[in-house]
A protein has these predicted regions:
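N-terminal lobe of the biotin/lipoate ligase/transferase fold
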Residues: 1-149, 201-205
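C-terminal accessory segment of soluble enzyme catalytic cores
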Residues: 174-224
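Short, acidic Gly/Pro/Ser/Thr-rich loop/turn segments
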Residues: 51-52, 162, 177-178
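Conserved phosphate/anionic-ligand binding catalytic regions in large, soluble enzymes, centered on
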Residues: 161-173
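Short, well-ordered beta-strand elements within core beta-sheets of diverse protein domains
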Residues: 94, 157, 195-197
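Histidine/acidic-rich helix-loop-helix segments that form or flank divalent-metal centers
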Residues: 152-155
Length: 224
């Protein structure tokens, strides 16, 4: 069986998984994939409250460093928040499935979130100013109503020896106020939303089921 035709392992962790412990487990899995000892994997989990700084992070974007623990990590991107109610999706996958094109892979991740949210009647989109998935909300004022961009999912990726890892953070029902301690994505006045904040109540299990279905369908269209 071709290395790109092997099945991917789906792992779902219950409870809150410590961020640094998750990094160790992910790094170990990546090394096993490189050595062809284990299959590629998609790991679904949640973290305790934490701020993480990617390789492009500017610490001036950390507005409240005492609010939660702050960890510098090796994923791409800038500052983000992780916490309960947010679905973390760590994708450990061979970049050869995407013609070794990191932009194509990121496009796949964005497409995955957009199609999964659509299953729950949430319309979302890419934004040319920042990687991730965004949606609109109506902002009301005395003079007029207008649509504003709100981020609903973040993407941060790293590649080691042609294996991509880290992945996605999708806001299902986190405490949105916890994002106030940072400038998400380094974009001043960036606004954040969630599935719940969009008026949709779903369980993690329902989201995971839809995500897996869309992942398997999309992978067939993206893989060479």
């Amino acid at each position: 069986m071709s290395n790109l035709k092997k099945p991917l392992d789906w792992i779902i962790s219950k409870g809150l998984i410590d961020y640094q412990e998750a990094l160790k487990r992910m790094e170990s899995r990546v090394e096993d994939i490189i050595a062809d000892k284990k299959n590629e994997a998609i790991w679904l989990l949640e973290h305790p409250d934490i701020y993480t700084a990617g390789t492009s992070a500017n610490f001036r974007d950390l507005k409240d460093p005492k609010r939660f623990p702050v960890i510098t990590t090796n994923r791409g991107g800038q500052f983000t928040y992780h916490g309960p109610g947010q679905r973390i999706v760590y994708v450990m996958i061979k970049l050869g499935r995407f013609d070794y094109d990191i932009r194509k892979y990121v496009y796949f991740l964005e497409d995955l979130v957009i199609k999964t949210l659509k299953d729950f009647d949430i319309t979302s989109h890419r934004w040319d100013k920042a990687i991730g998935v965004w949606t609109y909300k109506i902002s009301r004022s005395k003079s007029s109503d207008h649509l504003d961009q709100y981020k609903i999912a973040s993407i941060g990726v790293r590649v080691r020896r042609k294996i991509a890892f880290h992945g996605l953070a999708i806001n299902i029902a986190p405490n949105i106020q916890n994002f106030e301690g940072i400038i998400p994505c380094g974009i001043k006045n960036a606004k954040v939303t969630s599935v719940f904040d969009q008026g949709v109540e779903i369980s993690m299990a329902d989201f995971d089921k839809s995500l897996k279905s869309n992942f398997n369908k999309l992978l067939k269209t993206y893989s060479p």
